[in-house]
Amino acid sequence: KPGMSELPSDELDVIKLKQGRPVFGVDLRIVDDEGQVQPWNGESTGEVRVRGNWICSGYYGVEENSSHDEEGYFGTGDVACMDPDGYMRITDRTKDVIKSGGEWISSIELENVAVGHPAVKEAAVIGVPHPRWTERPLLIVIREPGVELGKEEILGYLEGKVAKWWIPEDAVFVEEIPHTATGKISKKDLRVQFAKYPLAGAPPATGGQS
């Protein structure tokens, strides 16, 4: 974009870490759970939907076209936010995002912060059922060999680095985290493994998140 070369290096680095701007000929919008189009303000998140002459018309072998909305936008399954200059930052996948009290929490962003702790070898975050908020984040951690790391320390490490209501409800330590054939963390297997995980002090279902 014109003028980028004049930006301070730290601001330029932030832009370079984003996924870029929509290419010519593609309409792009960010949509929430209710189908409401989200503003390009660098904060609002939702599913990325695209429309254009060379966007796929559907999935091969699937007769019912459920991949597009009534306006012809294709749901990519990516969760992202757009800044005012049109640069996109992908934060998660719709199947992995944690929907808590009507808000979306990025599992990937939580994982990226957690692995910044020197005692964390690998981390995964999934949503587990909660009677009040529908889902709450659960942090699953593999410690580095020979180091001590407790629940309070790793959860405290996240404070100030993410929104307060993003802080996982609990943290568990494991010896192994399942992966797919391509080397990605298998959130599907983790959701099955921890489907009935008891969140300590989960209150009865009442009201909305505050």
Show the residue positions of the predicted features:
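Short, positively charged
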Residues: E6-E11, E153-G160, L199-A200
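Secondary-structure boundary/capping positions in well-ordered alpha/beta enzyme cores
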Residues: V26, V120-K121, W165, E169, ...
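AMP-binding/adenylate-forming catalytic core of the ANL superfamily
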Residues: G52, S57-G58, V79-W166, E176, ...
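Phosphopantetheine-dependent thiolation modules in NRPS/PKS and related acyl-activating systems
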Residues: K184-S210
